Amino acid sequence: MGKPRPHKKKASKTREKSVLSAGGSISKRKMNEDPRKLLEQATILLQTGQADAALSIAQQALEIATSNSPAQLSSLNTIAEIYVELGEIDLARKHFLQAVELDPTGSIPESEGGGAEKFLWLAQLSELGGKDSVQWFEKGVGALRGIFRRSPLFFIAFSRASYQADIFRWEEDAESRCENLITEALLVQPSSPEVLQTLASIRISQLREDDARAALSRSLELWKDLPPEDPHVPDFPTRISLSRLLMEVSMLLEALEVLERLILEDDQSVEAWYLGGWCLQLLAEIGEAPRDPEAESNETPESKRHASLVASREWLKQSLMLYDLVQYEDERLKEHALELVEAMNKELGEEMEDDSNVEDGEGEGEEEWEGIESDSDHEMADS
């Protein structure tokens, strides 16, 4: 499952203001800032759900970046992606188009802010759709081919390409074009987790779930036993997407293991806690519980269901607590989490205040965590 097309919101005048319009001038301190460091800060904020704060810092980077420099190009792309996260599609498109003006063919290296990703985003965000989307997509693919055999970063960007598969559905050769792209990628890098996830996403869209499961299993085997700092471990967003794909093909235990590992790496991720809670709720529906070597072998489906529901509620409550704490901005996620918790409260009863402490992870909640420990497109929240 790929990243869902974001909903369009009315552009916020406040968000559109630049640093100059807000203050009239840029302070000497800001002039001395390194745009690259500011963009690193903005990226971290975006990944932790603080899109508005990320936008402010990325705009600072753009204002102090030298004209026609890699920093300016990187700033435009980062700001555009933040606007996508905020649902400000017109502003996102505007900044991606400005980035295209600086790198019209995608020949500038990704390390300098160039590459194909802006074309792939514009394909997804096209107002006209149809042929306009296809033209942007194929421009992106052309840029990707230019770096195909030179850079492993291709595979990160290629994963984005799969998200555009839907725009080809109106064409007769849609499936063959997607197949050609994924085959090309697999020939060059058959052991890339990102490419295997892309293959799984395409197989899911083709209703070939067994093939999707096989691709996801291969992707997991490549890195699941590696330490977190190993460079072969996919980045955090890629593994979030992986967990969604695993859930979509009912590989729930595998999805939960991925999410548990993500929480160990970043326990402030609203989306990881939410997906883990949802995954546990799905396990409860089929009378299953997380793997636990110490669990009694004669556990009944009812006891497994109860254990999964209790754990699910804890994960979801932690997600909701962090949602408010970091001012996360995905209303659909919050609504779905609240809906799930409400349903669990009806079955389990309202939780006592001192039963667990989700804020500091102590007490009964921590014991439940130890029992399940093994080491965001919001598309699924609509299902």
From Swiss-Prot:
Residues 1-12 have a biased composition (Basic residues). It is found in: Cytoplasm; Nucleus. PROSITE patterns: TPR, TPR_REGION. Residues 350-374 have a biased composition (Acidic residues). GO terms for cellular component: cytoplasm; nucleus. Coiled coil: none annotated. One of its GO terms (biological process) is cell division. This is Probable assembly chaperone of rpl4. It comes from Emericella nidulans (strain FGSC A4 / ATCC 38163 / CBS 112.46 / NRRL 194 / M139).
